[in-house]
Regions:
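Pocket-lining segment of extracytoplasmic ligand-binding domains
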Residues: 90-92, 126-127, 163-262
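A structural signal for short loop-to-beta-strand junctions that line the ligand-binding cleft
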Residues: 102-113, 239-248
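Ligand-binding clefts/hinges and TM-proximal coupling segments of bilobed small-molecule sensing domains
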Residues: 141-155, 230-299
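Pocket-flanking alpha-helical
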Residues: 48-52, 64-104, 120, 176-182, ...
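An extracytoplasmic/periplasmic, membrane-proximal ligand-sensing/linker region
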Residues: 177, 184-185, 194-212, 222-229, ...
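N-terminal signal peptide c-region/cleavage motif recognized by signal peptidases
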Residues: 15-17
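Bilobed "Venus flytrap"/periplasmic-binding protein-like clamshell domains
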Residues: 31-57, 61, 115-184, 279, ...
């Protein structure tokens, strides 16, 4: 997908009568591009709601969501200045910050989005009940370029399974393609992550029903011992239709990242607006209730990775000293 370059970080919009006015004078309006992912997944859902809430809270902001191929495209688009902000899953962010398989990035964290406990979903009438039951079966591991297949790869490696050897791996062109493939039998299971993740919601609400498969307690311990950046997480009961019990699993935090040279005053303004909009964002999207300043400090691999402009605001409100 072609994305037009961002000509400048902050664009002054003086579109006649459409320009924001204060006391009869035009107000500087910041146009911010936000990369999400392919349609039908959790990132576009989050990104669209994030943009709407932020724009409503501050009429001098214009955050524009853009569909992309996901985390692995968003990182280079940020690095090349073609995006100002982007949603990035925990595993690609971890690899980029640590320089795993690539040079270490200089991108910064604006906010933690939400925790993403990973698990598989199968039809309710499926014979499969454990991860090892799924060996040899066609599994949809998520969209190409997204962080989901990376999380599953780390998780499976932690229990001595190889994603592309022990399973018939299927990588989707669009995240929204997965549920239909489970329902019609093209794949035995779909891998996903998060609370209220659209693919899981679709399957759980379908007439066929759904059952979730997550690592067992021993498997969780093994995964965390080998890949400590993955954390134990729980999907609360009621997160999906007909899900009557909590589900323990592992996962990571996703982030809103900024390009390295995003101005401090812009990041400060975004952090301030977001902090004041936490309640509104939570009402629009359940998993966005985790988008808080406190969670950002807790989830960041290193506080030095948080944008200095955001950190300035966090100090002002006493979240960090």
């Amino acid at each position: 997908m072609y994305i037009a370059p961002v000509i400048c970080a902050v664009l002054l919009l003086f579109a006649g009568g459409a320009a924001a006015q204060q006391g009869g004078k035009p107000i500087q309006k910041a146009t911010i591009t936000l990369g999400t992912a392919t349609p039908g997944g959790g990132f576009p859902l989050y990104g669209n709601n994030f943009a709407q809430v932020m724009n409503d809270a501050d009429p001098t902001l214009s955050i524009e969501p853009r569909n992309t191929k996901g985390s692995y495209e968003n990182i280079p688009l940020l690095e090349s200045g073609q995006l100002d902000l982007a949603l990035v899953a925990g595993e690609p962010a971890y690899e980029a910050f640590k320089g795993i398989g690539r040079p270490a990035t200089h991108l910064k964290i604006l906010t933690a989005m939400y925790s993403s406990p990973g698990m598989f979903v199968v039809r309710a009438d499926s014979p499969y009940r454990t991860i090892r039951d799924l060996k040899g079966q066609p599994i949809a591991f998520g969209a190409k370029g997204s962080g989901l297949p990376v999380m599953s790869r780390f998780m499976l490696d932690g229990i001595d399974l190889k994603q592309d050897e022990d399973f018939k791996s299927v990588y989707l062109d669009h995240a929204g393609d997965g549920p239909a493939m489970v329902l019609d039998g093209r794949v035995a299971a779909l891998w996903g992550a998060g609370i209220g993740w659209p693919g899981f919601t679709t399957l759980a609400a379908s007439p066929a029903g759904a059952r979730f498969i997550a690592p067992g307690a021993d498997e969780i311990a093994r995964v965390i011992a080998k890949h400590p950046f993955l954390k134990p997480m729980t999907v609360p009961a009621g997160s999906y239709p007909n899900q009557n019990a909590p589900i323990d699993s592992i996962g990571s935090w996703s982030f809103v990242l900024t390009r390295a040279d995003l101005a401090d005053d812009v990041a400060y303004r975004l952090a301030r607006t977001l902090n004041g909009s936490e309640g509104a964002l939570c009402k629009k999207l359940g998993q966005a209730c985790e988008t808080t300043a406190a969670n950002t400090l807790a989830a960041a691999p290193d506080v030095a990775l948080i944008h200095p402009g955001a950190m300035k605001y966090f100090r002002e409100i006493g979240v960090v000293k």
